[in-house]
C-alpha cells in the first residue's frame, strides 16, 4: 500500500469566529477579536489587549472524565475538529475502521502549571492538583486528548515551539 497524507477537512475556533463562516465574514468585514482585558492590566501587563476566544461548553458533548485533562487549547481544538470532520464527511464509524491521525500545532502550555503551583503553595499538598493537571501542561495535550476522544489509531503529531 502506498503511504499518503490526505487533508480532508478544516475547522476553526478563534477570536474572530468559531466557525469557517464566522471567520470568513470577520475577515471580509475587517472585524477584530481583540479586546481590552482589564484583568491583564490588574496583573501588571503593560497592555490589556488580547484576543478573546469564547469558552466552549462541552458538558453535553464530553464526559467529565474526558474533560478533566483538557485545557482551553484542547477545548478549542475539539470544537474545530468536530467542524473539520463534518466538513470532510468523516464519521466516527470511518475513524473506527481506518488508520486516521491528526496533526496539530500547539505552543507552550503554562496556565495548568501556574494553577497547579498555586494549589501546592496554598494547600501544601500535591494530591489536590487533580489527575488531569499533568496532561494539561504538556505541549502535546491537544493531540493526546483528541486522539483519545476520537479513538484515533493513525499517526498523531504535535508541532510545537519553545516559545
Where in this protein do the model-derived segments appear?
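Conserved "HGTGT" condensation-loop signature of ketosynthase/thiolase-family condensing enzymes
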Residues: 1-155
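A short, small-residue-rich loop immediately preceding and capping a beta-strand
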Residues: 155-161
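Alpha-helix N-cap/helix-initiation motif
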Residues: 70, 162-163
Amino acid at each position: 500500500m502506498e503511504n499518503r497524507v490526505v487533508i480532508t477537512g478544516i475547522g476553526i475556533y478563534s477570536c474572530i469566529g468559531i466557525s469557517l463562516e464566522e471567520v470568513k465574514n470577520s475577515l471580509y468585514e475587517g472585524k477584530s477579536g481583540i479586546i481590552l482585558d482589564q484583568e491583564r492590566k490588574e496583573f501588571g501587563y503593560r497592555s490589556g489587549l488580547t484576543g478573546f476566544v469564547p469558552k466552549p461548553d462541552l458538558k453535553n458533548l464530553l464526559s467529565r472524565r474526558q474533560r478533566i485533562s483538557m485545557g482551553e487549547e484542547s477545548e478549542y481544538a475539539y470544537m474545530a475538529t468536530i467542524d473539520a470532520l463534518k466538513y470532510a464527511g468523516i464519521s466516527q464509524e470511518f475513524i473506527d475502521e481506518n488508520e486516521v491521525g491528526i496533526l496539530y500545532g500547539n505552543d507552550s502550555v503554562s496556565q495548568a502549571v501556574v494553577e497547579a503551583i498555586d494549589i501546592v503553595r496554598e494547600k501544601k499538598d500535591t494530591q489536590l492538583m487533580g489527575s488531569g493537571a499533568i496532561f494539561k501542561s504538556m505541549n502535546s495535550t491537544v493531540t493526546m486528548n483528541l486522539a483519545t476522544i476520537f479513538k484515533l489509531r493513525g499517526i498523531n503529531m504535535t508541532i510545537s515551539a519553545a516559545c
